């Protein structure tokens, strides 16, 4: 067996499949593009769905890749097991309607066992297969596999909802009896017992059926094109090749672990408890790659995942004695390890470090708040003479403050308390169920559309013409090809078309189709790309259409022109964003419509009004310079040498289209554009907002719509000026400032009057002192405008020795507000309010001397006041 580095293993995989005529598909971004069913790219096949469902036909039906992926469903196992990771690489080879079972198994065995390639010992390999899949069993036997190494497993059938499915055969590497202390042997595989002896290194999915959840598996229809979909975990394969005890002892992780040793002063012991080292090493890989691919920490979606990973890593750093920001210092090491295939981490190192460090610094403040909460919880337990920290509180520490359960348990035990593991798991399960309920349903590859996939007639798009004559090649109605049509809605393919198919964020052209007499026979309402690249025109039929006949196609010129204004302006906006807020502001989505443009980009905070002003001004400067817009077609390498910006998540072929706006903007783009920036007229930003963690959106308008937006603002300003009786609009600001000054004076006077009134009221309330069990208390309902007035009462109460305890209740709007203050060491205000608040259907808490609660049942206020004595 060869000793190979991780880079060599990855490259050997790609080289082998390239030798079998596979095209190497570059690794896609971790953030999915145009796939709402996925939070992350989570497998090697995730980016190839379009090929397997037939919506796009690949240039080469044989594909191989090394794809970075993120999965966080087993985050709690990371660091505990030898092979769980949040970020990993999946090596794959794929056949889209080309070779099938025979070649997949034969070539797979060759790659693993040939001395030219991985050279793994044949007697160390075991395979599982679906019991009904006798063909796979026979292929393995033909390869020379011992029958005792072939294990039938009922679960070896791959399907996720509707779409491609089929049996799979998994390959395992036997690491020997050192990893099988109970000497169970192959039964570990046959009975699916969790173990470290038999390591799954590869899964070959034989996709031959269109799964239909409505029928039994035996009734699944055969796919028109059978596929191969495989996945081999790089980390596991490297661990096998390097003879490592766990994945973490390979060259993918050990350099990171060595850096953690330097930062912590602790030593990694392969045979000891190294969970914190492993968690940090794993999580910083995920953070580095995800942030580099445009995701940013936040409170929802993938941003929440990153924040959780970072906080978990920070807490494990603290367990190692690292109490200052340190994760950002590991980013260069991650970049160097992966540089040979993933240079993007080092290329974006400064930005990634900045985001990680900033998030660490923010979390440092949160940790203090969480520590204070834990201290309070433990103090409350002690006061209540309880010995167990409740599961819901452990979960709140975990979910809100990022405290790992192990750390909470350790701190609680140090203080003499146990923790409620069962309650924590119940709270965790509730959250997971809520998360699953919020996930967009989907994820299967979709049913193959054979009719569209089988369109082979050539069709070209003519950028230069807005009208032309062209022969009708294909008519599709109700998913069937027909020769003629005279009514309804159908799909058409022409040999040549001036109609732009929706793509790259630009909406499709609309227009008319006419016969040789000039009569309109169809209205084009949409244009989309067919699997083989043809333009599919969706039309409302108004006359007679027949295959083989030539028709006159003309687009809606005004619509196209308005869309082009917005598309060219989008390129200017993208460049301006880079210049004003930084190169990290990469495109995360765009829409070039008729009436507006929408641009999504990665950024970690709201764009300030001043920055928006600069961006808007810079775009308009480029418009007024009347810069020519040029387009050329060239190969991808030449385009990169020109400095062309490749858009986020896009895949490009060998030949690309480069759109240049002078030297201000150079982008790869297949859309339609103006000839000169001056044609845009004017550009105006109408809105900037956050649409998700780390993603901002700008909505803007151009030309006529921009003029109308400015006119609308002017009309509003005139109306305000009239209301304020300002003769000139430039006097509006001064008038508003004057009104604000008057308002502040009135508010101050009002506050002073309230304070005087409160003092008078307090004098009456503080006279009503009662006593129980030797404690003097005041309990009263008061009439106040807001909860702040309750605190004012409490402040006055503290100034003199009126009583030991104060309880005030106020009904404000639809809410009941309760305040408890205590001067007695025997009465904890926070505990007392927890007992009283439920009476008014509320909840609350606080410190020993002051606590507040909110409720909703005003009818129970008298009951709450009466209950004060019972709880003292």
Curated annotation (Swiss-Prot):
CDD domains: AlaRS_core. Binds 1 zinc ion per subunit. InterPro entries: aa-tRNA-synth_II/BPL/LPL, Ala-tRNA-lgiase_IIc, Ala-tRNA-ligase_IIc_anticod-bd, Ala-tRNA-synth_IIc_core, Ala-tRNA-synth_IIc_N, Ala-tRNA_ligase, Ala_tRNA_ligase_euk/bac, DHHA1_dom. Zn(2+) binds at residues 567, 571, 669, 673. Belongs to the class-II aminoacyl-tRNA synthetase family. PANTHER family: ALANINE--TRNA LIGASE, CYTOPLASMIC, ALANYL-TRNA SYNTHETASE. This is Alanine--tRNA ligase. It comes from Streptococcus mutans serotype c (strain ATCC 700610 / UA159). The lineage of its organism: Bacteria, Bacillati, Bacillota, Bacilli, Lactobacillales. The gene is alaS.
